[in-house]
């Protein structure tokens, strides 16, 4: 018979196309990954460059909108200078020519408690005539009032040229105005920053000595509250912490309990206690009768409050009290605007809080290319040791502009010398000048560490450029500059009891034209706040002669702020457990020699989706020309590891020239790498055009080395690209040399549409020894679309022993082994057969023996005939 040579080539072409497709897909996926990652790397680089460029631009930009809250960056530099909020009041003056005498006025709010004023823009009227820039002028205060009220009074900044021909520059703070310049055409705007200030008070109490026992375990704190959690420390902003405490056991004089602040807070603010053993006194805690219950101190270095009980507690029980203490920013540990942890420990009990610092930007000045820009802050005042010192930080040209003939004036007063306790002179003042490498790294808190690598000290370059020619004024000639400078001032104040007021002024011109004169000033005045508390207790009770103690003064307890409920952490999704790969060593000698010479529509829809030992020995004993429609629909959901021991003695004598277009589209996706070395040398011209296009893309590497020497020359080019890794070593040497040369021209159209959708990982090593040498031109379109995607080698060995019609006796029907305890459908079939069998009318033993003998003879003859035909075929080949 003719062989289909083109079939193999077609399959090879398909395989080549598939390999090419896979290769193309790999190239596309690889390119996508490669270019995708590269693109992200480029974006990251661009973002980094953008960030760097943005920082540089921000450092040199003229905009003053530098209000972004940054991530806290704690500075670990050892600097014990404590903080107290200092109030700044700035005014700037801008004109096109340098006047002989200039005065500017500001408004400053003064208040002893807790009000903050908002900076408001002001303006200048300048009617000065032109003067030479070389004439050094000293900006000087004209008049100023500080009223310790919540109202605004006018301050003024004065500029003198040899203290002659002074002119007044009105700076009303209520509304913005413009500059009137008689000789210039430009009208730049002027802005002032108003801040309240408070006078420095004297210490309240002396430090208490803790000589007793720490009784934190006997003290319980409650009703803790922060007055506010957001403020501007550069505008004298601060907060208060309030708490109640209860002594749960007896204590004696000298015993103490403690409270500790976090790094982001201080209890001393900008008051410097470094010359006082780093200890700050706190107001006494007193009873309602005025008796001192406890004395308190604050350690600057450890940030610890110590409350020492007096002898008042010796005969008392049920001691209850409360305290309220001011808290300030730590400029060194919280240098940038942002939110910080503020967890406070009271008597070993932690109260967790967050606090946000919105520092006013230190980058301020005139809004034009050559506008003067300067700011300053008093960051430490010694009020306790008697040395009367203070520390001040000045940022010169923080906008990093190109300026010409720049002068900076540091003054110990604002309006009038007699209204300030500040002293600026060559003997009272020490100046250190630093050049800033990166302006963007300047702190928002005005803290500057002299050992910071971002600061380069250049004090020696200014030895001959610092002058004290005018009373209480230090004049520094910077000249032409393009960089930012930091000036650290260590000064003194006197004992007159006046407020410490300072002022810094910068003036410069356009370095190109040597004109366009600009001036900007900044005022400072520090604030001190004090706290205190109260307590009471009951006298010890004597059962015989009770002595009542003073009544307890109940204090209204502040409502504690509710603590936020933490969001529950999402539980991780459980990872799916991988399903074990079936061991598809299915030696399923699926000798599907289904010489279905009958019209047995054996629609064996064996959805062998699982491990069913589908030994469906459905002996559909239909006589070959007997259209025994044995619809053996063995829906054997054979969920088994398909130990398909199908003893299919397919003794089909039927010369089934089965042109069986067994388009078994068995999409056996059973990843079965069916390397079926099926040496199908069966020269059986079984021209069974069984286009078994079993494109079973069984991509499972199941090395199903099914050496099924199924010597069937059935051009079953099952190009099953079964790349299945499922090492299904089904060595089913199904050498079924079943020379089934059954010439029974049983043209049985056995449409055995066995749609056995065996959808499991079927290592369908269907070693179908389809030795169908049967010339049975039975167009049995067995379109067995057995999508055997399963492990079920559903060997529906329908032993269609045609011509036999042998019904085996019930007691001889062998039940297949079922190691998994699953339902054996063949048993059910046997029982049904037993029930429906015809009554026996003859001798059972004789019929049985005759049938067995005939079957054996037929089998022997078939084997001999098939072998002879195979040998003949080999000889012809």
From Swiss-Prot:
Give the SUPFAM superfamilies listed for this entry: Bacterial adhesins
Site entry (Cleavage), positions: 197-200
Motif MIDAS-like motif is found at 272-276
**One Pfam family here:** YSIRK_signal
Segments of skewed composition (Acidic residues): 556-801
Question: Where are the annotated segments for Ligand binding A region?
Answer: 45-542
Compositional bias segments (type: Polar residues): 44-61, 68-95, 120-189, 805-816
Q: Which subcellular locations apply to this protein? A: Secreted, Cell wall
Q: How does it sit in the membrane?
A: Peptidoglycan-anchor
Q: Which residues form the propeptide?
A: 842-877
Give the location of motif YSIRK-G/S signaling motif in residue numbers: 15-26
* Biased composition regions of type Basic and acidic residues, renumbered to the chain: 833-846
**Pentaglycyl murein peptidoglycan amidated threonine: which positions carry it?**
841
Q: For bias kind Low complexity, which ranges apply?
A: 96-119
Q: What is stated as this protein's family in its record?
A: Belongs to the serine-aspartate repeat-containing protein (SDr) family.
Q: What is this protein called?
A: Clumping factor B
Question: What taxonomic lineage is listed for the species of origin?
Answer: Bacteria, Bacillati, Bacillota, Bacilli, Bacillales
């Amino acid at each position: 018979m003719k062989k289909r040579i083109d079939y193999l080539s077609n399959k090879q072409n398909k395989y080549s196309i598939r390999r090419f497709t896979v290769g193309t897909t790999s190239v596309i996926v690889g390119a996508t990954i490669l270019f995708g990652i590269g693109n992200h790397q480029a974006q990251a680089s661009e973002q980094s460059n953008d960030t760097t460029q943005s920082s540089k631009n921000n450092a040199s930009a003229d905009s003053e909108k530098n209000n972004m809250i940054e991530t806290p960056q704690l500075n670990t530099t050892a600097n014990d200078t404590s903080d107290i909020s200092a109030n700044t009041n700035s005014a700037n003056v801008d004109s096109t020519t340098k006047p002989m005498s200039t005065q500017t006025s500001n408004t400053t709010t003064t208040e002893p408690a807790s009000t903050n004023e908002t900076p408001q823009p002001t303006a200048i009227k300048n009617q000065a005539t032109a003067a030479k820039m070389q004439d050094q002028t000293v900006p000087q205060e004209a008049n100023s009032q500080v009223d310790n009220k919540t109202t605004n009074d006018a301050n003024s900044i004065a500029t003198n040229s040899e203290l002659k021909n002074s002119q007044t520059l009105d700076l009303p703070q209520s509304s913005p105005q413009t500059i009137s310049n008689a000789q210039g055409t430009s009208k730049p705007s002027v802005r002032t920053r108003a801040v309240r200030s408070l006078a420095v008070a004297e210490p309240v109490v002396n430090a208490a000595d803790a000589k007793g026992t720490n009784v934190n375990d006997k003290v319980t704190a409650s009703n803790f509250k922060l007055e506010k959690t957001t403020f501007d420390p550069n505008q004298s902003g601060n907060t208060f912490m309030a708490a109640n405490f209860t002594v749960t056991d007896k204590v004696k004089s000298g015993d103490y309990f403690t409270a500790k602040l976090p790094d982001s807070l201080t209890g001393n603010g900008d008051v410097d206690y470094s010359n006082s053993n780093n200890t700050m006194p706190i107001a006494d805690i007193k009873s309602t009768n005025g008796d001192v219950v406890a004395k308190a101190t604050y350690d600057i270095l450890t940030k610890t409050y110590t409350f020492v009980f007096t002898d008042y507690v010796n005969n008392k029980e049920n001691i209850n009290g409360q305290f309220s203490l001011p808290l300030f920013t730590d400029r060194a540990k919280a240098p940038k605007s942002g939110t910080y942890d503020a967890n406070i420990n009271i008597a070993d009990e932690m109260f967790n809080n967050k606090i946000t610092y919105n520092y006013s930007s230190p980058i301020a000045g005139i809004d034009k290319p050559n506008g003067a820009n300067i700011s300053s802050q008093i960051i430490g005042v010694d009020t306790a040791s008697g040395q009367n010192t203070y520390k001040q930080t000045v940022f010169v040209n923080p906008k990093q502009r190109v300026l010409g003939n720049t002068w900076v004036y540091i003054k110990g007063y604002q309006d009038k010398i007699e209204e300030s306790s500040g002293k600026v002179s060559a003997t009272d003042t020490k100046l250190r000048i630093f050049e800033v490498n990166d302006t963007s790294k300047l702190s928002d808190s005005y803290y500057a560490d002299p050992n910071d690598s971002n600061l380069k000290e250049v004090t020696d370059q200014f030895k001959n450029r610092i002058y004290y020619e005018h009373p209480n004024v230090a004049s520094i000639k910077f000249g032409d500059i393009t960089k930012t400078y930091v000036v650290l001032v260590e000064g003194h104040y006197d004992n007159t009891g006046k407020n410490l007021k300072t002022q810094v002024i910068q003036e410069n011109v356009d370095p190109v034209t040597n004109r366009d004169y600009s001036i900007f000033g900044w005022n400072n005045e520090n604030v001190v706040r004090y706290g205190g508390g109260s307590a009471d207790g009951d006298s010890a009770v004597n059962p015989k002669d009770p002595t009542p103690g003073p009544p307890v003064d109940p204090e209204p307890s502040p409502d504690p702020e509710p603590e936020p409920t933490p969001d529950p952490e999402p539980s991780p999704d459980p990872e799916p457990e991988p399903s074990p790969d079936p061991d598809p060593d299915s030696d399923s000698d699926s000798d599907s020699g289904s010489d279905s010479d009958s019209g047995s529509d054996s629609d064996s829809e064996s959805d062998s989706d699982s491990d069913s030992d589908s030994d469906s020995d459905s002996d559909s004993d239909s006589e070959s020309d007997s259209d025994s429609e044995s619809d053996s629909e063995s829906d054997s959901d054979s969920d088994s590891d398909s130990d398909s021991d199908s003893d299919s003695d397919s003794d089909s004598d039927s010369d089934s020239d089965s042109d069986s277009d067994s388009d078994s589209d068995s999409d056996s996706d059973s990843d079965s790498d069916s390397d079926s070395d099926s040496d199908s040398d069966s020269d059986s011209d079984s021209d069974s055009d069984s286009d078994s296009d079993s494109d079973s893309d069984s991509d499972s590497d199941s090395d199903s080395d099914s050496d099924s020497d199924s010597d069937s020359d059935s051009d079953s080019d099952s190009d099953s690209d079964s790349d299945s890794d499922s090492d299904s070593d089904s060595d089913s040497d199904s050498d079924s040399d079943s020379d089934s040369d059954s010439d029974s021209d049983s043209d049985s159209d056995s449409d055995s549409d066995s749609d056995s959708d065996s959808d499991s990982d079927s290592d369908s090593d269907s070693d179908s020894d389809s030795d169908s040498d049967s010339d049975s031109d039975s167009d049995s379109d067995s379109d067995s679309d057995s999508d055997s995607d399963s492990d079920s080698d559903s060997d529906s060995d329908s032993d269609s022993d045609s011509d036999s019609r042998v019904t085996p006796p019930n007691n001889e029907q062998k039940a297949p082994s079922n190691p998994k305890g699953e339902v054996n459908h063949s048993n059910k079939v046997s029982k049904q057969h037993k029930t429906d069998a015809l009554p026996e009318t003859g001798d059972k033993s004789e019929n049985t023996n005759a049938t067995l003998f005939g079957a054996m003879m037929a089998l022997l003859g078939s084997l001999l005939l098939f072998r002879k035909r195979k040998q003949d075929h080999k000889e012809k080949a």
